[in-house]
UniProtKB/Swiss-Prot annotation:
Interacts with SKP1 and CUL1. Disruption phenotype: Altered electrophysiological synaptic activity, with increased frequency of miniature excitatory postsynaptic currents. It comes from Mus musculus. This is F-box/LRR-repeat protein 20. The modification Phosphoserine is found at residue 421. Gene3D superfamilies: 1.20.1280.50, Ribonuclease Inhibitor. The lineage of its organism: Eukaryota, Metazoa, Chordata, Craniata, Vertebrata.
């Protein structure tokens, strides 16, 4: 809020007179003021620091800077800013996000590691200047590190994982997605020193083979979350080892791992009863047989991405409707064998009335308005995707909305092709083509 006083615009932090601020400082003890300041975000703290010398000291006290997220300022953050923050915060800092801060490199992060040895959560996602030298610094100075995000730090190699293994034994969550220089040797070194890992994100680590998963399965019994999206060399052999060694697994993403078969679904059903999230988009070898075993054994499933699992039929939906009462999000896009009958079972199933929130049916050519009728009873349904479902009509969507007025329906209806010109010589285009 700003006011105009004698033609001069002032922020609310500049509206205190010296006497006002003096009264506050006199009435409230320093400890209480510090406690109040501890609830303020970075921007507000910086504004408070400009009110007076006393408030400058309070606002910039290291105890107020235990959690810092600089994502909103990513374009402006350079190495010297991180160095200054680390010197001011010191041992108080527990959580820092530098996500997207392209100007931050190894030298600044070495200073940070030296000064902030109690750091527990650090995000360097997208900090592309970061190399193995940073992980060496973290290993040397930050033994309390629990969560580390290095996604898209493409210079990271096996040396980083070896360093983390040696110096960060408390590590529970590591994201090295798109660090495509990492191989099975790096994973082997990591898990031998960080056996308490609970979440491992390996999306786009295209050099990883089954051998890497065998190391994880053998050394990470606490693993809860594993993301292997587009790890194209992974097969049943490696993932079965994960299932047998990581019984606490709750979330698995294997989307794009096109080599896997029903053997994985059987292994999950037999070994991972706590599974809540399964993403297997574009895994075209999976069938109803595997999903039947999965559904009958994993009753806590909440989210399933089955996009382009082209062999599944209504049989899978029948099993999910019977055995998975907690299902909230289901993607069936490009599952072209799904029909209205499968949606009918889902709409009458255990999850329908209170749980199901999102269903995606893009490019399901056999789906008609009858499916929308079956989904009317899903009172928690928030969103439905119907792109390129050519038998769905506007009238069917309108009827669905009368029962579920707050639902978001994403659909597309091709514009009508304009009539030919009188002379008949003009080429006909649909409206989309004309616009383009």
């Amino acid at each position: 809020m700003r006011r105009d006083v004698n033609g001069v615009t002032k922020s609310r932090f500049e509206m205190f007179s010296n006497s006002d601020e003096a009264v506050i400082n006199k009435k409230l003890p320093k400890e209480l003021l510090l406690r109040i300041f501890s609830f303020l975000d970075v921007v507000t703290l910086c504004r408070c620091a400009q009110v007076s010398r006393a408030w400058n000291v309070l606002a910039l006290d290291g105890s107020n800077w235990q959690r810092i997220d600089l994502f909103d300022f990513q374009r402006d953050i350079e190495g010297r800013v991180v160095e200054n923050i680390s010197k001011r915060c010191g041992g108080f800092l527990r959580k820092l996000s530098l996500r997207g801060c392209l100007g931050v490199g190894d030298n600044a992060l070495r200073t940070f590691a030296q000064n902030c040895r109690n750091i527990e959560v650090l995000s360097l996602n997208g900090c592309t200047k970061t190399t193995d030298a940073t992980c060496t610094s973290l290993s040397k100075f930050c033994s309390k590190l629990r969560h580390l995000d290095l996604a898209s730090c493409t210079s990271i190699t096996n040396m980083s994982l070896k360093a983390l293994s040696e110096g960060c034994p408390l590590l529970e969550q590591l994201n090295i997605s798109w660090c495509d220089q990492v191989t099975k040797d790096g994973i082997q070194a990591l898990v031998r020193g960080c056996g308490g890992l609970k979440a491992l994100f390996l999306k786009g680590c295209t050099q990883l083979e089954d051998e890497a998963l065998k190391y994880i399965g053998a050394h990470c019994p606490e693993l809860v979350t594993l993301n292997l999206q587009t790890c194209l060399q992974i097969t049943d052999e490696g993932l079965i080892t994960i299932c047998r060694g990581c019984h606490k697994l709750q979330s698995l993403c294997a989307s794009g791992c096109s080599n896997i078969t029903d053997a994985i679904l059987n292994a999950l059903g037999q070994n991972c009863p706590r599974l809540r999230i399964l993403e297997v988009a574009r895994c075209s070898q999976l069938t109803d047989v595997g999903f039947t075993t999965l559904a009958r054994n994993c009753h806590e499933l909440e989210k399933m991405d089955l996009e382009e699992c082209v062999q599944i039929t209504d049989s899978t939906l029948i099993q999910l409707s019977i055995h998975c009462p907690r299902l909230q999000v289901l993607s069936l896009s490009h599952c072209e064998l799904i029909t209205d009958d499968g949606i009918r079972h889902l709409g009458n199933g255990a999850c329908a009335h209170d749980q199901l929130e999102v269903i995606e049916l893009d490019n399901c050519p056999l789906i008609t308005d009858a499916s929308l009728e079956h989904l009317k009873s899903c009172h928690s349904l928030e969103r439905i995707e119907l792109y390129d479902c050519q038998q769905i009509t506007r009238a069917g969507i309108k009827r669905l909305r009368t029962h579920l007025p707050n639902i978001k329906v994403h659909a597309y209806f091709a514009p009508v092709t304009p009539p030919p010109s009188v002379g008949g010589s003009r080429q006909r285009f649909c409206r989309c083509c004309i616009i383009l």
